């Protein structure tokens, strides 16, 4: 999908760059594959804000997307490509030979009428899913499981992908777009191709109101807050914060390592995504 820029006929149109979604399905989603979605405004079950800058926005229906791809050796035809308000990627409605319908993440170069299949060893074409044990090294992949049968967790956002670069015992080595090199079990499933909508990050929404429609609220800098609200707050007049940059909870930000050294998954990370910085 290409980008669409607008003439500055109004202040909100000036600089506006959006994704051209004219080729996507214009109707409503499949009712059996949707659920209601209530808003929480970034609050958890105790009512406290756990995710700042969230709230409001247009009402959404949740589309039930199949991240597991565990319906093996049954071919499915792509019925249509749809917009999903709950994620940056597009989704594809597929219909299996037995009549069942499902939503999957739409990879790049997947078109209406294409056939996709999940199998122990499938063709290397966008949308096909298989475990690493049946996949050739060098394959570009997305929707990667971290635990067998749990469903894809890595490389699900628009334009993202990873590369299968090697085998090591019962593990597969994958290189993520962040530069991280990590291991996952060879029984884990992954889908061939890169996720659709790679131009998503090049959009310019043009005005604050468009972000409010998406449920995004303003972000306030710590240095303009009061001391009770942020470690950078307070002071007479404009100040620099007076200390190294930290989060509202006092944790170093902008580059300092804050990962727990005892985290179990550290032994599965061969090369950190930070290794390219400062010669680490």
Swiss-Prot record:
Disulfide bonds: none
Compositional bias segments (type: Basic residues): 254-264, 271-280
Protein keywords: Ribonucleoprotein, Ribosomal protein, RNA-binding, rRNA-binding
PROSITE patterns reported for this sequence: RIBOSOMAL_L2 (PS00467)
InterPro entries: NA-bd_OB-fold (IPR012340), Rib_uL2_dom2 (IPR014722), Ribosomal_uL2 (IPR002171), Ribosomal_uL2_bac/org-type (IPR005880), Ribosomal_uL2_C (IPR022669), Ribosomal_uL2_CS (IPR022671), Ribosomal_uL2_dom3 (IPR014726), Ribosomal_uL2_RNA-bd_dom (IPR022666)
GO CC annotation: large ribosomal subunit
Chain spans, region Disordered: 226-280
A GO molecular-function descriptor: structural constituent of ribosome
GO BP, sorted A to Z: cytoplasmic translation
Domain of life: Bacteria
Protein family per UniProt: Belongs to the universal ribosomal protein uL2 family.
Subunit structure, as described in the record: Part of the 50S ribosomal subunit. Forms a bridge to the 30S subunit in the 70S ribosome.
Function in brief: One of the primary rRNA binding proteins. Required for association of the 30S and 50S subunits to form the 70S ribosome, for tRNA binding and peptide bond formation. It has been suggested to have peptidyltransferase activity; this is somewhat controversial. Makes several contacts with the 16S rRNA in the 70S ribosome.
This protein's name: Large ribosomal subunit protein uL2
Taxonomic lineage of the native organism: Bacteria, Pseudomonadati, Pseudomonadota, Alphaproteobacteria, Rhodobacterales
Primary gene name: rplB
């Amino acid at each position: 999908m290409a980008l669409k820029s607008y003439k500055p006929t109004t202040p909100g149109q000036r600089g506006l760059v959006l994704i051209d979604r004219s080729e996507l399905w214009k109707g409503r989603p499949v009712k059996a594959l949707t659920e209601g979605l209530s808003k929480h405004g970034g609050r958890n079950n105790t009512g406290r804000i756990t995710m700042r800058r969230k709230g409001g926005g247009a009402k959404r229906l949740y589309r039930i997307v199949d991240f597991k791809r565990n319906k093996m050796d049954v071919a499915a035809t792509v019925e249509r490509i749809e917009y999903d308000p709950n994620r940056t990627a597009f989704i594809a409605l597929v219909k299996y030979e037995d009549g069942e319908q499902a939503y999957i993440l739409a990879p790049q170069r997947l078109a209406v009428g294409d056939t996709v299949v999940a199998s122990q060893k499938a063709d290397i074409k966008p949308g096909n899913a298989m475990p690493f044990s049946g996949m050739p090294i060098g394959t570009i992949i997305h929707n990667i499981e971290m635990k067998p049968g749990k469903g894809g967790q890595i490389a699900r956002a628009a334009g993202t992908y990873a590369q299968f670069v090697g085998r090591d015992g019962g593990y597969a080595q994958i290189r993520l777009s962040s530069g991280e090199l990590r291991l996952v079990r060879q029984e884990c499933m992954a889908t061939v191709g890169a996720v659709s909508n790679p131009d998503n990050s090049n959009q310019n929404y043009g005005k604050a109101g468009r972000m409010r429609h998406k449920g995004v609220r303003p972000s306030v800098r710590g240095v303009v807050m009061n001391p009770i609200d942020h470690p950078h707050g307070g002071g007479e007049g404009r100040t620099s914060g007076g200390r190294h940059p930290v989060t509202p909870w006092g944790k170093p930000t902008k580059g300092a390592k804050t990962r727990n050294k005892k985290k179990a998954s550290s032994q599965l990370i061969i090369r950190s995504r930070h290794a390219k910085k400062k010669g680490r």
